[in-house]
Amino acid sequence: MHSKVTIICIRFLFWFLLLCMLIGKSHTEDDIIIATKNGKVRGMNLTVFGGTVTAFLGIPYAQPPLGRLRFKKPQSLTKWSDIWNATKYANSCCQNIDQSFPGFHGSEMWNPNTDLSEDCLYLNVWIPAPKPKNATVLIWIYGGGFQTGTSSLHVYDGKFLARVERVIVVSMNYRVGALGFLALPGNPEAPGNMGLFDQQLALQWVQKNIAAFGGNPKSVTLFGESAGAASVSLHLLSPGSHSLFTRAILQSGSFNAPWAVTSLYEARNRTLNLAKLTGCSRENETEIIKCLRNKDPQEILLNEAFVVPYGTPLSVNFGPTVDGDFLTDMPDILLELGQFKKTQILVGVNKDEGTAFLVYGAPGFSKDNNSIITRKEFQEGLKIFFPGVSEFGKESILFHYTDWVDDQRPENYREALGDVVGDYNFICPALEFTKKFSEWGNNAFFYYFEHRSSKLPWPEWMGVMHGYEIEFVFGLPLERRDNYTKAEEILSRSIVKRWANFAKYGNPNETQNNSTSWPVFKSTEQKYLTLNTESTRIMTKLRAQQCRFWTSFFPKVLEMTGNIDEAEWEWKAGFHRWNNYMMDWKNQFNDYTSKKESCVGL
């Protein structure tokens, strides 16, 4: 009798446990399938640091911009009836691939890792498990000079952030190059800024859908690096974006950088040049676009590089422009007038922002040696990075950046050219943006990233390079299998915590007493925080001398001596010819009148 009772108990226990497992399994599966406004999506569970993160990869957020939709603003998506399988990254947008250093991880880690296609408007969502209620959302916008980039890179994996800080991470693909930014201003067939409108539509998707994933649409922080940071700053200016996010983080980029925004004249000129190069020159603008729409995307990509009369390693051949829609006026004017979203911002730069670009064409520079250059090579480098600047303008840069204490030491010229490129293109614009923004009473926090990753594949002389804070922001060093040092793990943990705190509360400071308190950046004191593996410090007025040169002195030099951009090249050549004709005519007229006077009285 006793054994029968035991068997019954065991059977009951077996079926009870089986039922619990089935209930648990179906519960997990229910959590993985989420109903969006357009239809259901299926994600997948990932094991991260002994816990779980649910990833939804490759969710469509717009109609594929194919055929007649090429060069147009993105169109809203229609509904689907089946369950969308969001378990792998989608296509990357069409772009040129960096083939400068074949097989070298340092450059190839930034190349797209999924198929290239015009059908590329997809986004990714990482959510902590169990599904949160009202979690803060961080939306990543990748860099790549508006010419390249994709959300599926390993370095942009949102699972660590989601797991460690219980935030929701979102990233989207947006169109780049001519397919994303070609513009005939005023023409609805190619209005320009399509890539920015892609981003904006993804932000709208988050507002409509993130609650279903456990996110809070009223707590959304944008963060991006390089052109991604410039994009974030443009969303601060664009009235159509203001209601779609709460706060902003800008890593190594801002809209006032010299590469970030293209003038209307130049944007139009480049479109016409592309039309010429692809055999699409027509009298009628709409016919030009019609012809370009019928071209293979590869043909457009191949000709993109040749639309400017001169190029630099930082050339943005097709980028944001003032279209009267996304951007209502020149960004500098909008900033000056205070016409931007009033909110908290976190901004920063890396110690050696310029070095990454030197190995892409500056004389004497190579990733395979110490790149010790001469004064002459420094001058040649200035010609490459400042092709439209007068000789006097280049001379003023040379004078300001020469170390006159030891002007014969070759290492000084190598470092000086890196500083020139970094200060002019990244550090000083970011500081100036933060100063202007904070003058309107907004809390701003500024960082200076000083740590060179132990895993950096580029040579030692390149220092703390552009783009190499990203892995610390996304928490990659927390994955011990990746063999970062213990100090790097601690640094990354601190950065992740500060970024998440800023996103949640508008203040990056940690609650623990042992961490350095990050002060608010004000235009007077300009306090900033250094980020490194040794001792975090509070400093003031980063690169004040150099930035005063770029913001105050250099523009005056250009004004007095002429800074010739591509639009002016043609105009000045035409004016020069006209001036010669006029002088010739005047000389002949003077000659005629003098002869006439000498004839009087004969």
UniProtKB/Swiss-Prot annotation:
Changing residue 153 to F: In BCHED; seems to cause reduced expression of the protein. Keywords: Disease variant, Disulfide bond, Glycoprotein, Hydrolase, Phosphoprotein, Secreted, Serine esterase, Sialic acid, Signal. Inhibited by mercury. Inhibited by Tabun. Tabun forms a covalent adduct with Ser-226 that becomes irreversible upon aging. Gene3D superfamilies: alpha/beta hydrolase. One of its GO terms (cellular component) is blood microparticle. One of its GO terms (biological process) is xenobiotic metabolic process. It catalyses: an acylcholine + H2O = a carboxylate + choline + H(+). This is Cholinesterase. It comes from the Eukaryota. The keyword ATP-binding does not apply. The gene is BCHE. The active site is at 226 (acyl-ester intermediate), 353 (charge relay system), 466 (charge relay system). One of its GO terms (molecular function) is choline binding. The modification Phosphoserine is found at residue 226. Esterase with broad substrate specificity. Contributes to the inactivation of the neurotransmitter acetylcholine. Can degrade neurotoxic organophosphate esters. PROSITE patterns: CARBOXYLESTERASE_B_1 (PS00122), CARBOXYLESTERASE_B_2 (PS00941). The keyword Secreted applies.
